[in-house]
Amino acid sequence: MSSLMTAVYGGGPFYTGGQPVIDDLKNSGFTTVVAWAVHVNSSGDLIYNDPTIVSNGQYVGDSSWPGLLANLKQGGSVNRLLFSIGGWGTGDFENIQALIQSQGTGPDSILYKNFQALKNAIPSIDGIDLDDESLYDQDTTVQFCQMLYGLGYQVTFCPYTMMSFWVNSLYALNSQTPGLVTGFNLQCYAGGAGNDPKDWIDAIQKKMGPDFDAAGFVFPGLWCRNGDGCTQGDCPDSITSQFKAWKPDGIQGGFIWLYDDIQKCENSGTCSGSMGTAAYASAIVQGLQG
């Protein structure tokens, strides 16, 4: 088994795909699965893409989902499950900010109650991934993350820009509570296509000090084959080449965006060789270990 962290983000199929999707992930070689995206509406409800899954302190999602997600981490390659909040064009973090300003983050607040209900219903969730692409408010981020940590969640950040915001938020959180934030899942595609993990590693190192393992904290991600005709994005072999180029930076893993597109394009024939889930997990490992 590799000690590298290999993650895959995915959306609807994780909720609607049933046991076949769970089995595909378990047999893939990916060590982390990130369910994307949880949205927080103005009343604090938690919505997984379209269906509401938590409301008024109660889990109201598909009753079979907690069992499927528990099974995900049993007997396969997956050892960590994250739920990601946000994305492009959502008001999730603005809603979180407004809810914190009106109710705080204590046990009586709806944010606390709903994230506690999520953890109680699906205890196999290890952490919450923050994909803030609009608000970038450090006070909101710090208060929200401290609440999540108190409920038993790890926290990861999923940045594509605004480096100083993310690095300063990391410092504010981890200088008070070492280990609260466990990594940056750095988008190196779409809006983040110009990102070089080394720049982020250097910025984290400078802020956090010489004893902090900045190289082991940044996990770059690439977008698999996608788009009309599956002609956009990366094939597994180009992902291997990119991770090989990043290997000297000392990174210890990476991620693939997006499982939905792996499913869509797996049989498109637009890459030489396999385009299945396992091929993409292997591509990261081959790049970093080859």
Please annotate each region the language model reported.
Residues 257:
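Conserved, well-structured core segments
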